Design a protein with these regions (language model features):
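Polytopic transmembrane helical bundles with strong interfacial aromatic enrichment
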Residues: 1-197
Length: 197
């Protein structure tokens, strides 16, 4: 068991590191106006100020999946540290890793690194949707996606408890995750409502 869990932890850390590196690369490509990438061409432009330019990271579906995967990775590191102190790491992290794997599969289908077809590299991008060119675009989506990610640990804890046939365990262990996730998600929704109205 110890060797398998050690390999699983190493694999999870490698996956999370890869997600961090891929996210950093995408952000660097956006800031450097690399319009040969379809996603960057479709959502950014040279005229955007730095804050809005960086927010084009998650302006489209591909980038939103990347942000979601990044947030799930961050929360996963915290969850792994939490479960290492308890006796449910194997089950909980197994379920949580399947959530991360699903998001990674979505990123394979909706690849933010897809190149524009043909040999012509555009001089400028199409730019950010005018409705999204707002200060709140820089704050609202990351908070919202962190809230989404924070709701995954209670699910993993519940399924892990079912796998162990310890049906009450997950309630107390997931309470802090539910409250914290609800607060972050509530803040994100409130900011979105403020932005919309």
């Amino acid at each position: 068991h110890g060797h398998v869990i050690g390999f699983a932890r190493t694999g999870f850390h490698i996956t999370v590191t890869t997600v961090f590196v891929a996210s950093a690369i995408l952000l660097i490509l956006i800031v450097k106006h690399q319009f040969q990438f379809h996603y960057i061409w479709a959502y950014s432009s040279r005229e955007l100020p730095l804050g809005l330019l960086m927010s084009t990271f998650y302006a489209g579906q591909e980038g939103s999946f990347m942000l979601w995967t990044l947030m799930v990775s961050i929360v996963g590191i915290v969850l792994m540290l939490y479960t290492q102190r308890h006796d449910n790491e194997r089950e909980v992290m197994g379920v949580y890793t399947s959530i991360l794997a699903f998001l990674l599969m979505l990123l394979i289908v909706k690849n933010p690194f897809a190149l524009i077809e043909g040999n012509v590299i555009p001089e400028d991008g199409r730019g950010l949707n005018p409705l999204l060119q707002n200060f709140w675009m820089q704050i609202h989506p990351p908070i919202l996606f962190m809230g989404f990610a924070a709701m995954a640990p209670p699910f993993a804890l519940a399924i892990g408890a079912l796998m162990r046939r310890r049906y009450q365990d997950w309630v107390t262990s997931s309470l802090a995750w539910v409250v914290g996730g609800a607060m972050v998600l509530g803040l994100g929704i409130a900011l979105g409502g403020f932005w919309a109205y």
